Each structure stands twice: as C-alpha cells, then as structure tokens.
Amino acid sequence: MSDPLKMAAETEEIKPVPAAMGEKKDVVLCKKIVETLGGGGDQRVLLVGEAGIGKTRMAQMVDKEASKDVLCYQTLWLHLNRKFKVNDNYIKEKKFEDEWSLYENIASQLSLYSDFEETEVGERDEDEEEEKKVEDLLKDLKPKIEKYLLEKKEAVVKKLEDDKKKKEKEAAEKLEAEKKLVDPAAKKAKDHGNKNPTDAAKEKTTQVVAGGEDKAQTSSERKPYLLLILDDEGMTSEYEVMVHLGLEDFLKDHTPRKILITRRQETEEATKSGEHAEGEANDSQSGEKKEDTDGEDEIRSADKEEPESQARVKTEEKHEKVVPPTIDDLWGSTNTYGEITFQTTNESQDLLESFNLKEAEALFTSSMFFKDMPNFFFDPVPGTDEKLLNHMLKKSKSLPAAINVLAKSLEYTVKSKSYKLNKDEEERLLKEKIEMVLSAERGNPSDQESSSESPKKASGENPILLLAYKLFKTDGPLKDTILDCFWHSLDFFEHCGCVYYRDLITQWILEGYFDPVRSVEKAYQDGHSIFMELIDRGMLKIQENNVVVPEMAMRNVIDPRRGGHLGKSRLGFSRVYGGNKRKGIGKITQLDDMIKTVQAKKGDKITTILVSGDRLRRVTPKKFFKNLKELEVLGLFEPTVKPFVPSFSDQLKLLRVLIIRDCDLLKSIEELKALTKLNTLEVSGASSLSKISEKFFESFPELRSLHLSGLKIESSPPSISGLKELHCLIIKDCPLLQDLPNIQELVNLEVVDVSGASGLRTCFDNADGAKKNKSKNKNFYLLTKLQHLDFSGSQIERLPIFQDSAVAAKLHSLTRLLLRNCSKLRRLPSLKPLSGLQILDLSGTTSLVEMLEVCFEDKLELKTLNLSGTNLSELATTIEDLSSLNELLLRDCINLDAIPNIEKLENLEVIDVSGSAKLAKIEGSFEKMFYLRVVDLSGTQVETPELPADTKIHCLKRFTRADGKCFERDTWREIKEDIERDRSENASSSDAVVISQEITEKKPVEIREVESNAPRASDCTEKVDVNKERLLKVPIDRALYQKALTSLVDSKIPQEEVLEINETNKLDEEALASAEFVSFVDCTPERVKSIFEKAKLVKGCWLRMCFDIKDPFDGVDEENLKSLETLSITNLLSLETISFIAKLENLKNLSLDCCPKIKTIFPEMPASLPVLNLKHCENLEKVVVGVEVSTHTNLDLKVENCPKFGDYVMVDHSDVPPPHEC
C-alpha cells in the first residue's frame, strides 16, 4: 500500500449512508463524517456555509461521536474567531504572546498548568515577581502537553495490542478445540494445507475493525489518532495556526492527522480575495472546547460576500513544500504543509441538507420553552389549516441557529415578570406579533446587481431571526439600551473577534449606552443585566472562561433604527481596536466604583481606568494619577474637580484612549497636546469649552476616533484635516459651530456626524477673498468607507457631491444620509452613487424645492424615505424604482400637488401624506401593495384610492381618509366595506360638520384667523384641537399668535411666562433654567429630554402633537421634574405610558386628550394626584394595572369618549365625535 504521507490525494467522494429507520439526517451525517475522519491516512473535512446553518453544532456532534471510537485518543478544539498576529514581522521579531495564548488554551482543555501558574502569588520569589518571559513560559508548558498527549496515545496503542493478543489467543484456543473434534485421519490430510494456528488467528482478526463491520480499513491500516477541530476559521486561518504558531511541528508525533474545519462562507470568499487579517487578538482564550449550544461561533465577515447559499471548494495541485502556499492553496482539495498531504472532503452540501423540518421540530421541542408554550401555537394560521407552530418552523429556512434563538427568546418572554402579571393581554400581543412578522416575509429580489453588491439584503431577512429581534422589550428602566448593546455586539465581533465578557460590558459603557454615568458601578451592573438577557435570549453565546461570541446568524436582520448602530455609538471603538489587544482595554474588573485593569500579582501595572466624578472626588487628582504612569485607557464621567486636566496630562504619556464626558467646568484642553499617543479622544458635554487651537490635532497623528459634542466652539480646528487614520468624526450638538475641517481626503472615515450644529451654514470654506479654499469638502467620492453621514439640525445650504466624472465607483457603503431639519438646504446633488442607502431622511428641510430625477436611481436597498415638511412641488418619477421601500413619509409637504406612479412599490407598509394640503392626486393603484399597514391621507385633497385587494401581513390596518375619518380593521377588505358603508349612510360625515361648526363657534376670533391661514389637519385627532404645529409654520402676525397660544395653554397663566418650544427654535440658556411653564409642539423625544436636562423648575408643561413620543419623560432625570404641578398631553399619537409619574409628589393636574395608543397610564398609582382628565383615548382601559381607580376616593376623575375604559363611570357628551373621528 502507498504511503499516504507521500501521495498527493484527490478529493474523496463519499456515497451517502442510508438512514436507519427513524434516524435523523444530522445524526446520519455526523456518523458519516466520523467514518471519513477515522479512515486511513491524513483526513481533513470541511463544513462551509452561511451563519446559522449548524456548522459548530455538527462539530460538537462529531466530537461526541468520535469519542466512541477507541482509536480516537484525544480531541482538541481551537476557536479561530480571534485575531493572531502571525505575519512575517511576528516570526522575525520572535513575538511569543499569541503562541503562548494558543498553547495555554490547549493546556486548559487538558487541565494542565505551568509551574508559574500553580504557584501562589505570596509564595513566589522576588525574582519571579518580575514578569516572566513568555518564551520561558512556553518552554515550561509545551513539554507538559507533549507528555500528556503521548501518554494518551501510548495507552490506546497498548490497549489495542493487548486486545489483539487477547483475540489471537482466543482464536488459537478456539482452533485448538476444533482440532480435537475433527476425525484424526481427516485432520491429518487437512493439516498439510493449513497454516499454523497462530497465523490463522491473525488472518481472521485482521478482518475486525472498530465498530465490528468490514466497512472501513482494517485495523492494521487504521491507527490511533488525535482529532483537531478548527472552529469558525476566518479571523485566523488553518495555515497561520499550523505553520506560524508551530502547531504542525508540535504535533509531529501524532499522525495520522485528522482535522475538522468549520468556516463561514463569506469568510472563505474574503480570504480568497486576499483580505488577510492582521492585528493581535484580545486576551480571551480561543482554544477551549465549546459549550453545547446550537448555531455556531462565527465572527468574521468581509465587505464583499458570496451570494450563493452553498460553499464550494476548489481543487488545487500540490505545491512544493519549499514555497509558502498562497491563500488559494489553503482552500484546495489538498492542503500541504510540512510533510503531510491531506485528503480533503467537503461536507458543506450534506450539512445544508441535514437539517429539515423533522430536525427543526426535534430541536424546538427539546428546548425549555416547549413545556411552557402558550396554547395558541397549536391554533391554525389565519386563512389556513396549518398550525402556527408548524408554520413558524417552516419559516426557519433550515437554520438551527434561528430555531435556537427563537426558542430562547420566547422562553425569556413568557418567563418575564411583565408577561406573568398580565398574561392574557401579553399572550394576545405575542400572538399578534408572531403572526405579523411571519406574514411579512418578502420574496427574494431578482435584481442581479442587488444580489452581487449586497447578498445579505438580497437574500431577504430570515423571519424567525427577525421575530426573535422583535421580541426585545424596550419599555423597562433601560428602555432601548439593549438594542444598542445588541447591534454593537454584532459589529464589534465582526471587527475584533471574541472577547471576555467584562471587556464587552466596558465597551458598551465607553460607547455611551448607559449615559449619563454618575456611578461606574451602577453602569456596569446595568450592562451586566443586559448581557445576561442577551445570553438568555441566545443572542450572545458564552464559551469556557467567559469568552463571548454572538449568534452571527442575526446579521441577517437589518437594523431598522433611523440612526442605526453608528448613530448611537460615541466612539466606534471597534474600528480603533480592530482585534489588536495592544489597542484594546486589556483584562479588566469592576471594583470600588471603578473599572480598571486586573492585577493578577503584585506590581502588575494598571493600564485601564474608568471612573466617575463622584468617585474621583474622594482623592486628590494629582496624587491619584501620580502612580498611574503606565495608564493607556482613561474614562472620566462627569468629573467635577478642577483643574483636573493638568493633573494627568503631564504624567500619562502612554495614554491611547481618553474620554472626558459631561464636564461643565472644562474650559481648555490645550494641555492634552502632551498625550501624543492618543488614538481615541472624546470631549463631550463641556459647555464651558469655547476654543480649540488651530494646530491642536497635529499632536495626535494616530487618532482614529474623535468625538467633540456639547461644546461652545465656533470653529473646528483645521488640523483635523491631517488625521489620515481617522475612522469616526463626531462634532455634534455644537450650536455655535460655523465651519468644518476639510475631510474629503480622510479616506478611512466611516462615520461623519455634525448633527445639532444649528449655527453651521456651510460645509465648504466660509472664508472671504483670496484665502477661500474653493475645493474644501467639494467632493466626497474618495470616502468609499463612509457608512453614516448626518447633518441634521444644521443650516447648510448645499451638500458635497458624491461622484467624480473620471471615476465610476459607487459609494455603496453609505447606508444612512440624515438631513432632518436642515431648514436652509435648497437642493441636493446627485444621490445616484449612494447605491447602498437604507434610510434617507430629509424631513424638515423646509427650503428644499427640488430633487433630481437621478436621486432615486440605484436605490435597491432603500427602506425609509422621509420627505416630510419639505417644499417640494413634485417628486421624481424614478420613485417607482424604489422596490424595497417600506415607508414613504410625505407629511406636511404644503406645495406638493401630485405624487407620481407608485404602483410598483409593492413592499410599502406605510404611506403617510397627512397635512399636504395641496395634494390632490396619487398616481397608480394600491391594489398590489399586500404588505400595506397604514395609509394616512388626512388634511389632503386626495380621493380614496384603490386599496389592496388582498392582505398578506397579519396585523391591524389603518386608513385615514382626507376628511380625517379613521378606519381600523384586520383586513383591507373589511376597511373597504366600512368605507362603502360610510358612504352610503353618509352619517359620520354630517356629524363631523356639525361638530366642527360648534367647536369653531367656541374658539376665539384670533384662533380662527390663524387656522384660516393654516393647511388642513395632519391627523384625525386634529378635528377637536387647534393644530399648533401649523401655527408655528405659517408666517403670521406675532401678536396674533401670542393671543392664540394663550387660549391653547391656560388663560390664567400670563403668556410672557410660557416658554414656547419646537424642534428647532433657539432658546436662551438662562431663560430655560428659570422657566416655570413650557409648551412643546412637534418635538422629538430627544428634544424634550434635552430641555428637561436644563429646565429644572418647571411647574406647568403642555405637550402637543409630538408624534414620535412613546414616553414623554424617557431618559429624563426624575429630580428635574419634582416641581411639576400641571401636565397636559394632547395629540400624542404614539404615547404608551408615562414613566415614574407616581414619584412626582407635587403633581396636581393631569390631562390626556386624543392619545389613541395608550392603554394604561401609570406603572403605579400616584399618591396625591387630585385631578385627572381623560378625553378621546380610544384604547385606554386602565389607569393602573391591577388597581381600580374607584378605590381612590380623593381623585377627581373626568372621562370623555374613552370606550374601553372600565375603571370608572364615563361622562357621556352628545357633542363629542365618535372615537374613530377624534
């Protein structure tokens, strides 16, 4: 037989093994892989495919099955979802850190430790206290591993030899016994042709193989073997581990070699393209055996992904061993390094086919959720006879990870306190959510360009993974912080790989998800709470030694939030860190209200500290920093001691990351120029900082992330233009800022956010005369990595262009272009190059009068188009090409008179043109828009269009007619019947006219004059309330407006004492600080929060037509609301609850009017609220869950037109319109 070590093998073709009766396909495949690996020679099996198909799950099954093979004496797991720096410099400079990490991980699997580790700190000599060289540690550890593995191998060899001798002896004895029974004469004749008994026994035993069947090689061909599992190859390749880190040479005595490799499909394609990852990994271990979880630990993704669902392996010829193999060689059917040539078998296709409905059912029913599953899972899906459970499992697209994540998310949901407290209602909402998400699945787009540029989007969102995401609850104390942490985790792991769990929580704090941080300990506890929820939901998976990886199948879900992950992160630290542990934060712990570096032994240096101002006040800053000269990462939250910058700037010369957050006392940062090694700098909330010198940033050539916000600077230092390594540039909420640096050649930029710069009038050069740089920020076509661009709230008149006539390349990476409330923006450049846009927000750009036809071309991924409040008189006809569009928002477009044909936009879910007073026509029919949920024509002149003929998405549909009348039903067929019935009866329309006349007669003359100049109401609720939003937008006499406002708020309060607030008006800081009465109109939640951060003496608050607010005081410090006595809320269509209002001891009067979504007002009943007025809240059921309001005898409760309210006897007013007309 030829020596397998010298023979160049071809790819082995394995015939499918027939399944045993009732045996699942994945079990059959597992046995097939073990049989292949256990065959003769060096074997290598590949499992390649997209995230979530069960590659790691199959590897775990193989590990368990291989342990039954007597010839497999050891399995070693190496998780390659981390970065090893193993390039030529690594070898040349003899750096052993990553090699140590690798062998330390192997030793931990074998329960082996170095002598140094086994020695207690107190028992070490002084010489040992000095850091022992990693090279010496390796010399100590490697022999232990070698000895252990050889002993395991020798034990198996000895057992095989003993078994062989035993069988030979038994065969000989059996043969001898048979001889005695044979006739002597016949025996004598037969003996001449027979071998001796021992030889006969040997010949017979060679037919025995492990498992007892002659289906593989004989025992003489099969040898004891070590199984090496390389899981989630990508961040580091097989070749890097085996050759550069020396594992091949280290295992030279353990042949034949058996290797099982799992690899994400897009990682394979990226590696073939030469996208070789460099950088050092974090300190977490990556070689330990993985916990028994479904899905797989997959980290790395490349910018360009393979659109096919299956991976293929090319066959390459054997290369000479003296020539280092290329990247392509690593993925061939043979892989050669050292003296070994592998037979490679690709089982990727069989893996895809091994998980179907039967396996999905088995996996789901084995989950903990199955026993607590609500009964409605066995109800039929509307319109079919199929049970909801079966229908749901079919939607998994054969992804084990999807089943696993959904089962865990459902289990977490039904075991939550809120679910148990109101089980019936929560169960109903859960069922509705499941039916809605499953029914909203779209078909895959057929456009080839879309598929090639973005296969993730082209393949469509997996409805099961999307459902798991939709199950996140954002109504708890931390609100939507869990969403920030979830999206950050996915992004972080793609750039950096696996991470220790404490490091991950610290990353969340650094990114600002728990701001304001008054206590680092409290922020860490909140982070740990979210971390555990993500673990429980299956979104994060924890390996041994608390190393964390995400469920990367969740990358299939597209972030639906307006700003996305990059819009919510302060640093984009993963772009700075990149998996290089020298640029990370190191191993940390939370202790004494600080987060700092773990000190494993005496004298270990501290390189990271995060500390709040409260904790810092306990010490003298200069003394505190004196002993921290090795510090590299420093986070200061709300520091209140001064002057604190000089206390560390002259000592911390090694600082790489500096965060100074929410420091009102900071007036200058010039001393920071001494910190020349900075790669990350944040100075935010420093309201006293008014100037940064022009050359300031010349001191930081390595800066990769810069965050300046909440400052009073008027000019941005031009030296920012020289930061060639910059990835994230955030200069937001600087209202006095008048210019920007020239950033058009900073080709590494991924985030540019200058939102809230209300004084910024141009992004070009604002200098005069000869000094003017006419090319400054003229063209962004070089910023090919840019993903997020936000100019919201600025006063810029024009944008840079995004293309060059000589370059045809597209800026496909840009997913969000946000220009909300850029009120001076007059026109847009061609947006055609921005082919990857998902969200385009131009709302509130009141000067925008024109959009080029090409702006909507090549926008196959655009999900949300918001043109509300613009002055566009027409839309480009190319709008019909936005095939992926889900939301079309054209509210208050007062000059728009027609919308071109949108009939092809069959993925639309929301069409809102409310308040567009001149709009009279929408071309095309809505008949084929089967996913449509909301149509709002109120305040327009549009006739009722042809509504969808069928309904695919299962949820409540809402149609608001031009006259403001609302129709809500489960299907469009029912809504059409209601509309037809309403037309024939003509009753509701006549009632509305009478009511309108009655209300008009009661209004002051001044208000009627104002309304006569305003457009039609933008929502059905505006029939019974003056549209103050329109009052703010119509140019009318100021005195007339003041009189009207007095009637709207409270005639008893002098108008000059009421501070009027909308989304964009400028407010005097001193007036805001002393304001006692505030009136909000059309404000975002962020605007309300920012006001209450400064206004702390408010007694009366009126909120009107703030359409996006779910909780008016979300994120507001309750201490700032202690003085509140009167709260009036009108026309808040999204209002769902009012947080911690029960703690407002001075609240005397609360009014809710036209808030259709709210069902329960308070989490708990206020102790001393005397007056509560409720009007036109059509879904309001309770004031407090589980508490009857009638038991509160001191409460003066008035209820009008709240049909579902059951706590109190309602007041019936004949002159109030029905709830659906409010």
From Swiss-Prot:
Positions annotated as LRR repeat: 654-676, 677-699, 702-724, 725-747, 785-806, 813-835, 836-856, 861-883, 884-906, 907-929, 931-951
The entry's keywords: ATP-binding, Coiled coil, Leucine-rich repeat, Nucleotide-binding, Phosphoprotein, Plant defense, Repeat
GO cellular component, one term: plasma membrane
Coiled-coil annotated residue ranges, if any: 122-183
Feature: compositional bias, Basic and acidic residues: 171-205, 212-224, 263-279, 286-322
One term of GO molecular function: ATP binding
InterPro entries documented for this protein: LRR_dom_sf, P-loop_NTPase
Record's comment describing the protein's domains: The LRR repeats probably act as specificity determinant of pathogen recognition.
Protein name as it appears in the record: Probable disease resistance protein At5g45510
Organism encoding this protein: Arabidopsis thaliana (Mouse-ear cress)
Lineage, uppermost ranks: Eukaryota, Viridiplantae, Streptophyta, Embryophyta, Tracheophyta
